[in-house]
Amino acid sequence: MPAGLTEPAGAAPPAAVSASGTVTMAPAGALPVRVESTPVALGAVTKAPVSVCVEPTASQPLRSPVGTLVTKVAPVSAPPKVSSGPRLPAPQIVAVKAPNTTTIQFPANLQLPPGTVLIKSNSGPLMLVSPQQTVTRAETTSNITSRPAVPANPQTVKICTVPNSSSQLIKKVAVTPVKKLAQIGTTVVTTVPKPSSVQSVAVPTSVVTVTPGKPLNTVTTLKPSSLGASSTPSNEPNLKAENSAAVQINLSPTMLENVKKCKNFLAMLIKLACSGSQSPEMGQNVKKLVEQLLDAKIEAEEFTRKLYVELKSSPQPHLVPFLKKSVVALRQLLPNSQSFIQQCVQQTSSDMVIATCTTTVTTSPVVTTTVSSSQSEKSIIVSGATAPRTVSVQTLNPLAGPVGAKAGVVTLHSVGPTAATGGTTAGTGLLQTSKPLVTSVANTVTTVSLQPEKPVVSGTAVTLSLPAVTFGETSGAAICLPSVKPVVSSAGTTSDKPVIGTPVQIKLAQPGPVLSQPAGIPQAVQVKQLVVQQPSGGNEKQVTTISHSSTLTIQKCGQKTMPVNTIIPTSQFPPASILKQITLPGNKILSLQASPTQKNRIKENVTSCFRDEDDINDVTSMAGVNLNEENACILATNSELVGTLIQSCKDEPFLFIGALQKRILDIGKKHDITELNSDAVNLISQATQERLRGLLEKLTAIAQHRMTTYKASENYILCSDTRSQLKFLEKLDQLEKQRKDLEEREMLLKAAKSRSNKEDPEQLRLKQKAKELQQLELAQIQHRDANLTALAAIGPRKKRPLESGIEGLKDNLLASGTSSLTATKQLHRPRITRICLRDLIFCMEQEREMKYSRALYLALLK
């Protein structure tokens, strides 16, 4: 036996083995059982026999009185599989047989006088009582050894152990209760992986189930609105629940649903207003508003108006009708508004902490499951080969404290960091009964945590999942630790790094019941959103997460369970952060919190992680109001009012009614029309307006097309330009004229300078004309100089900003050497569209009705 592995003082009662392989525990009066096994190589597929040696004292069978412990060990063998992906273990629970005839053999060296009786004292140890009243303390130490020799005992039970197989050990302690309805049990199921050689692909598990029973004389009932493992005896009357139930009978189911929604809305409003992210003044003001609303001091309109101002939120149109429908009935169900507000405030302080953090190890573990208590203890030890790691589960009963602070703690931790590569994996199960973790206090805290001390993880997985918690009238709380699979990241992984991290705690707030419900109505918990962050563990490897779905159920006896599958990924977000607070129906809050050392960092990020402002603003969602249903109801009830505004609107005439009616009667005299109805006048006025609108639209399009310049557009190519051709011809004429004028001037100058016969009249005329030409040129030069002087005195011409910007852009393009780049020119369209007579004539020519009309000819004459 390894050092330190000894049987506790409270040894288990003796056991016997039947021919069918059933190990039967005798009630009181036998020696412990020693189970031995032969070590076999880990990779072998052979069976490892396990022998159970029992030395009987007498050959007569023993009957199983009350308190008999029956244990059956049934192996489940499966061939080893090597694959790349992990798979979940498939544990199978074997039914327990009824105890048959039992034979107990004592060692040969033990001499007992006739009439000796083996009994178990109240303190735990076994005692031999002889007829002479001599009391001898028996040796109750059970040795766990591993030896290859097979004991020479005809009554042996061989348990075959194959790698990658799963075996279950089921131990059930049943005590006949006085009343079955008062039986309360606590079930602890723990599964431990056993990895194979090269890659961890199949995980065999050892399932240990402990079901203690304790008789009571009262029938326990469970409150539907409570989520903790609390029970209240039925002999204590609950006047508030009876009164609430009596009121509920008089209300219709629809009204009850509205009242429930309104109550949840007010409770959630108080919670969010009193949360840490809001100011204390806001919480006080919101509580005061709720109190005034419940006491009928203010009505729904004033309550919502003040609430919007206090929360700085946008108005919700459906909140006032919702409150009007349900607040009257809510006032009847909640006569005391102070107690309701006090319960809502206290709900934030009472939390139920359920924390699970399971970690897989790559070595072969030895499982020791211990449920300790001050009650009577019964144990059985099954041992195999030496294993390098021991994992123990202990349920401890804390010291007695205040009435509202009782708690049950279940701790699962690993012991021993050493690793071994060979030998048969041995599972050691030490099971002891304990009293149920059941109190009658409303605020009960149950903590389940797994703290690995120094596990060696090689590409393994850390799984965090909600335990399956089931509440009922005939059973207590069943806390199930789910199985864990190791996942090998790659075949080339050679280094093993220790992962040391603090456990993650999941807090499940347990508010007090605000409105008691009938005992037959189950209450389901629906999780909106659940995001978990894994705490950082220093320089650790990336851990792959396999999420297991768990079940969170609250039910009554005889009701069907309503599971809510929740998958919690933990590897997609940064460590030590909380993303969302989860709001559950029935005044329940499910939040996530890391280790106590990280609370300060989490509080700093509360404003950025939580979005309580959105929840406060969205009051309709908190009240559980379906907007589609409300809209349908409103449209259905007010359908007769639709269209009244349109029917009551008066048509505004486009033209003056008096002048229009006179003109219509003047035209109608030719057709014997002497009277005209007002509706006809209005219709003609509207028709005139529509005709003018259509005509203006056409004229606007025609004017825009007329004023559009297509020359600058890249989509058009200039094929002929008559205007430029005419300008070219005009320029030629001007050049010809300038040439002729220049020749005439030169001729005049030559004639003026000549000294020919002065009496020639032709010569005198030329001289006079040359002198006039010189005077004209001098006058033009003086006029140009005067204009330049005036322009210099006025100053430079101011350019438009748009033109200056375009010129600056051109200068920049030329300076940077990118003058070859040409921007796409858009069609120039003026901002003001001017319609002229040409546009109207063109429009009239295009219309078939106006093409041959008199108006077109009158327009053409203009």
UniProtKB/Swiss-Prot annotation:
Q: Which residues carry this modification: Phosphoserine?
A: 595
Q: How is it modified after translation?
A: Under stimulation by forskolin, Isoform 1 is phosphorylated by protein kinase A (PKA).
Query: Where does this protein chiefly localize?
Result: nucleus
Q: What's any one GO cellular component for it?
A: cytoplasm
Q: Where is this region: Required for interaction with TAF12?
A: 830-862
The organism's superkingdom is given as Eukaryota
Q: Name one GO molecular function term.
A: protein heterodimerization activity
**What biological-process terms (Gene Ontology) are attached?**
mRNA transcription by RNA polymerase II; oogenesis; positive regulation of transcription initiation by RNA polymerase II; RNA polymerase II preinitiation complex assembly; spermatogenesis; transcription initiation at RNA polymerase II promoter
Q: Where in this chain does the entry annotate a coiled-coil region?
A: 722-787
Q: Which UniProt keywords apply?
A: Coiled coil, Cytoplasm, Differentiation, DNA-binding, Nucleus, Oogenesis, Phosphoprotein, Spermatogenesis, Transcription, Transcription regulation
What residues does the TAFH domain cover?
256-353
The Histone-fold domain covers 653-702
* Residue positions of motif Nuclear export signal: 516-556
Region entry Disordered: which residue ranges?
219-239
Q: Which Gene3D superfamilies match?
A: Histone, subunit A, TAFH/NHR1 domain
Q: Which family does it belong to?
A: Belongs to the TAF4 family.
State the disease link.
Spermatogenic failure 13: A disorder resulting in the absence (azoospermia) or reduction (oligozoospermia) of sperm in the semen, leading to male infertility.
Its protein name is: Transcription initiation factor TFIID subunit 4B
